[in-house]
């Protein structure tokens, strides 16, 4: 809250442009994973926090965004790498049929932070290779 109050109090410079708060959550904010309920609940809580911040801060000129990474190749996914390699190769869970990388998430965050979506707030950007698509 202290950081938000400061962001509101200090007007943006011409160079920095619009200010943004970016929450990094996970597709687990909406996708159930029965073996990781605590993780899913925490991400879903952050997702609602982002939505509430967006609603509350819009009039203050602060845009709030949420990035939901999908299956990203990191140390956190190392234990399930073989399983996900197989599922990704089959094309059943990731339509783009590849792992996501931290750089994919970083590029999304950079676009939001640079004000590329200045007339958007509360935007949820899934960086998931299409995992959000409903398919038969």
What residue spans do the PLM features occupy?
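Alpha-helical segment proximal to the catalytic Tyr-Lys
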Residues: 5, 55-56
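Residue(s) in the substrate-gating loop at a strand-loop-helix junction
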Residues: 26
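Short C-terminal tail/terminal secondary-structure segment
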Residues: 31, 121-136
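Active-site loop immediately N-terminal to the catalytic Tyr-X3-Lys motif
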Residues: 31-37, 59, 97
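Active-site helix of classical SDR
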Residues: 42, 50
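Short, small/polar-rich loop/turn modules that mediate ligand/substrate recognition or access, typified
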Residues: 58, 63, 119-122
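A glycine/serine/threonine-rich, flexible loop-to-helix segment
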Residues: 59, 71-94, 134-136
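A conserved structural motif in NAD(P)-dependent oxidoreductases
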Residues: 94-105
